[in-house]
Amino acid sequence: MDPTIRLDQLPNHPPGNPGLPNAPAIRLEAITGRTTAHAGEATTTEVLLRIIGGGQPVSGARVPLNLCLVIDRSGSMDGQPLAAVRDACKHVVAQLGPTDILSIVTFEENVDIVLPAKHVTSPEIISAYIDRITAGNTTNLFDGLYAGGVQVTSVPLTGYASRLILLTDGEPTAGLKDPASILRQVEQLRAQGVVVSAMGFGPDYQEDLMASIARTGGGNYTYIAHAGQVAAAFQRELTGAMSVVATKAVLRFELPDNNQLAGDIDTMLPDIEAGTTIERLVTIKSGPRGTGMYRILKASVDASSPATRQPLRASADAIVQFADAPNASSAPRNPAVSAAMGLHSAALDLEKTLNGMRTMSFSAVDVTQMLNRTQAMLAQTGRVQEAAQVADATRAFQTGNQDHLEKTLVGTLYALDLGKTGGPA
């Protein structure tokens, strides 16, 4: 067998078989859009990569958490919003154990370390600290994020799933306010192995900034429309963090000669959780070649196990049969790949719609039609939650609720770009 181009037989392991014997936590599948192509011409093949989190950490015991809650307590959070956040924080504390590490930072004009990073051995005392959180004045997001980063990185990160959850209801109004400085902080935390998730509360925060924080930090972006949604948002984050089976995951590609990867692909992956699947759609351009079975792509995922502290690897090959038949490239496309391509188109349409609304480039009729079309496409491809979000955004558009509309659509776009399914609802 030619290890670089031609395959005289299929590899001796199926796609998705982990590349290392000590890597049961992750699997990788490579699904080609079409398994045949015309040998005599240049061809384009879509390949759907599925990174699957399987099983549980070793012995079924979850990985300890190193969790930091960074909470906005500016004046606009006074009343029901801050009360709901306090209750959600106490609910988080109740689910942690003595092997977990928790820190809590609040910010307004000034920053307070409510709880320095420590093991959760006295949840009642921690809850009492949380009850003392009261509203202040302005919003110093930069310093709050910095202080949270200091806490979460003050303990050895090996052996923990480290996560920082940021919640704010407004724009930065004190301290450093420029997005570039804020995102540099997040980038540094991510490089140290800390996942940063961002929650925006109410109608007044900058949704694009919060989504960028989550994207840079490898975490989740959540839009919380009202106080009644706070508890569920915190629970989703906690459940996901408790289910992590692989961290620091990176997607890698090996392309044999005469094959090229089209477009840009984000190779940094979010933490992989048990029961979740992360999808990435790539396009391979192949030049003319002789007939036979060829590998057009070898993909692998390198990660780290927070449970065993050992490296993980999973790999898979994309295989195409090149035949001397002009119609070989017109075979029906794999349904899963077709669905992934449909999702990609839906995301592009949604981004176009959002930008058009912001610049008032589309009429109300055009916007409604575009949103309805995107909703239908999402429903057809099984993304029921995202379809419901677009339906909610459509109602907001029709009633003139621009803030809710934009924040909802940014959240939907973020979820589609993340490409993750399964896990906590």
Predicted segments — roles?
Residues V245, A249-V250, E254-D257:
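Membrane-embedded alpha-helical bundles of multi-pass transporters/translocases
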Residues T35-T36, T267-I272:
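Beta-strand-rich interaction surfaces with strong enrichment in secreted/lumenal proteins
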